[in-house]
């Protein structure tokens, strides 16, 4: 049987959680960039996004974001426009809900942009769920 000469398994490849909940500086768009909202995830590192200049573009998630940052539909992203292809773009950055709200407050995003409020359902969030008792408790399963 061969010796294990590797340097670790999946966990080593996954890497450390860098700046998980650390606040980062708000990044504004520059020339050649545009804000967009994700319409549809296409798979294979691609997505369809509606840029706020009114153009629907096919976007490619770059390698730095590919496995570290999870992008869902209706997320606000920053895309880099291509000079040679107007209908394609590259995802540069994903804004979280707080950053998207502050971008909207600064007037960078239009008013019709809907910011996705995803709830992670942490501990103690189950207080609002109400279940109704369906059926009678005195009914025995043998009587059916």
Swiss-Prot record:
tRNA-binding among keywords: yes
Skewed-composition ranges (Acidic residues): 124-144
Record-level GO BP terms: translational initiation
Cross-link (Glycyl lysine isopeptide (Lys-Gly) (interchain with G-Cter in ubiquitin)): 88
GO molecular function, one term: tRNA binding
CDD domains: S1_IF1A
InterPro entries per record: NA-bd_OB-fold, RNA-binding_domain_S1_IF1, TIF_eIF-1A, TIF_eIF-1A_CS
Keyword list, A-Z: Cytoplasm, Initiation factor, Isopeptide bond, Protein biosynthesis, RNA-binding, tRNA-binding, Ubl conjugation
Tissue: Ubiquitous.
One Gene Ontology cellular component annotation held by this UniProt entry: cytoplasm
Disulphide bond pairs: none
Subcellular location field: Cytoplasm
Basic and acidic residues composition-biased segments: 16-26
Positions with biased composition (Basic residues): 1-15
Record domain S1-like: where: 22-96
UniProt keyword Ubl conjugation, yes or no: yes
Origin superkingdom: Eukaryota
Region annotated Disordered, chain positions: 1-26, 114-144
Record's function text: Component of the 43S pre-initiation complex (43S PIC), which binds to the mRNA cap-proximal region, scans mRNA 5'-untranslated region, and locates the initiation codon. This protein enhances formation of the cap-proximal complex. Together with EIF1, facilitates scanning, start codon recognition, promotion of the assembly of 48S complex at the initiation codon (43S PIC becomes 48S PIC after the start codon is reached), and dissociation of aberrant complexes.
Complexes and interactors: Component of the 43S pre-initiation complex (43S PIC), which is composed of the 40S ribosomal subunit, EIF1, eIF1A (EIF1AX), eIF3 complex, EIF5 and eIF2-GTP-initiator tRNA complex (eIF2 ternary complex). Interacts with EIF5; this interaction contributes to the maintenance of EIF1 within the open 43S PIC. Interacts through its C-terminal domain (CTD) with the CTD of EIF5B; from the location of the start codon by the 43S complex until the formation of the 80S complex.
Protein family (similarity comment): Belongs to the eIF-1A family.
Protein name: Eukaryotic translation initiation factor 1A, Y-chromosomal
